[in-house]
Amino acid sequence: MAVQLFFTEEQRKVFKSSFKSIDADGDGKITPEELKAAFKSIEIELTQEKIDEMMSMVDKDGSRPVDFSEILMKKAEQMRGKGAQYFKAFDALDTDKSGSLSPEELRTALSACTDPPMTKEEIDAIIKKADGNNDGEIRRAEFVRMIQSSY
C-alpha cells in the first residue's frame, strides 16, 4: 500500500499496535462498539453521536468497520497538513536559503529557544541523527522526518 511508504517502520508498528489494542475481536476492523469500548476502558464515556462522528472521519469507503488502511490514510492526511507547518519552520531556519540547514543555522536556532543553550556536541548529535545522506547538513525532507519521528 503506497500510504505505508509515508511512514517509518517504527511509526507503522506504533499505529498497528494501537489498532490491535482497539480491535477486540482481532478481525482487522474496528467497529463503533470496539471504539466505544476502547474509550470506556480509559474512563471516557462518549455518546453514540460522537462515536459515529469519529468513525465517519476515518471511514472513507462507508463500510462502517474501519480497517487499518483507513487509519493509515487518516494519519497520513493529518501529517500532510502538518507538513506545510514543517516547511515554514524549515524555511525560517534556513537563513541563507540554501535548501539545507547548516550546523551554524541549527545552532543559532536551537540556542535561541533552549535554556541553557544546547552544546555543540548536542547539536552535532541531532545533525548526525537527522542527516540521512551524511553531508553534514539537514535537507528539508530530513528535517521533516526528524520532526515526525519525535512524535
UniProtKB/Swiss-Prot annotation:
All copies of the EF-hand domain together span 10-45, 46-78, 81-116, 118-151
Q: Name the Pfam families on file.
A: EF-hand_7
Keywords of the record, alphabetical order, are: Calcium, Metal-binding, Repeat
For Ca(2+) 1, which residues are the binding ones?
Answer: D23, D25, D27, K29, E34
Q: Does the keyword Calcium apply?
A: yes
What does the record say about tissue specificity?
Answer: Found in cell lineages giving rise to the aboral ectoderm, a squamous epithelium covering the surface of the late stage embryo and larva.
Molecular functions (GO terms): calcium ion binding
Q: What does this protein do?
A: Calcium-binding protein involved in larval development and metamorphosis. Likely to function as calcium buffers mediating the transport of calcium from the sea water to the blastocoel where calcium is required for skeleton formation.
Which named protein is this?
Calcium-binding protein SPEC 2C
Naturally occurring in which organism (per UniProt) = Strongylocentrotus purpuratus (Purple sea urchin)
Q: What would be the name of the gene that encodes this protein?
A: SPEC2C
